[in-house]
Design a protein with these regions (language model features):
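PLP-dependent amino-acid enzyme catalytic core
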Residues: 1-211
Length: 211
């Protein structure tokens, strides 16, 4: 499976008087630049799931999300990119006209399957998954947000982008003291913690998640 252009994820320094006065350096890993749509941590969460889809021989992928889910948008784009059928189980009714996320997903060929909020809460129950198989046919299941063990494995690779970056080679500091990120399901944060723990670096950054 073709990797996205990870060399397009530079680390850029932020300059501000407040940072200078506090003697703090702040740098941003620009994961938003690796692809117009499958960017941020979404690619890393999907990568090994999609490799498993390829390995299993499955051609249809199903996942869950709300009406404004970035995961659903990224999965729809990835499905189109890699030639996979995609199905999104959407929480709540589909309101016409569709919002920009669902409209885009549909344009990518994704099937939108709305369920009640009550049924959506059953998304982790085997019985409900069986009902979806009966209704929709065979599919490879990716959890809500793309968060599972394969996602964590993918997010570990973000650590490599930091440690192998030209920025770190040129930095006066051997390693950042902290790595901060926004958190939803927590998969990206867990992947970073796991990835850093496997590093050979003697000094490792503390990972901070903001929700």
């Amino acid at each position: 499976m073709e990797d996205l252009k990870l060399d397009k994820a530079p680390i850029q320094s932020v300059h501000h008087q407040i940072l200078t006065e506090a003697d703090v350096s702040l740098d941003v890993l620009r994961l938003d630049l690796i692809h117009p749509l499958i960017h941020g941590s979404k690619w890393f969460k999907l990568k090994h799931n999609l490799l498993q889809v390829q390995k299993s021989g499955a051609t249809r992928v199903l996942s869950f999300g709300g009406a404004w889910s970035n995961h659903i948008l990224a999965l729809a784009a990835a499905g189109k990119y890699y030639g996979l059928e995609t199905i999104a189980v959407i929480r709540g009714e589909l309101v016409e006209p569709l919002n920009s996320v669902l409209s885009f997903a549909k344009e990518q060929g994704m099937q939108l399957y709305p369920v009640s909020r009550e049924d959506y809460r059953r998304k982790s129950e085997a019985e409900f998954i069986d009902e979806l198989h009966d209704e929709l046919g065979e599919f490879y299941l990716i959890p809500e947000g793309g968060s599972n063990a394969l996602a964590l494995k993918g997010c570990e690779e973000i650590c490599d982008l930091i440690f192998k970056s030209e920025w770190l080679k040129e930095s006066s500091s051997l390693t950042p003291n902290f790595v901060a990120l926004a958190c939803g399901t927590g998969a990206t944060m867990a992947g970073l913690i796991s990835g850093f723990s496997k590093s050979r670096n003697s000094i490792l950054p503390e990972v901070l998640g903001f929700s």
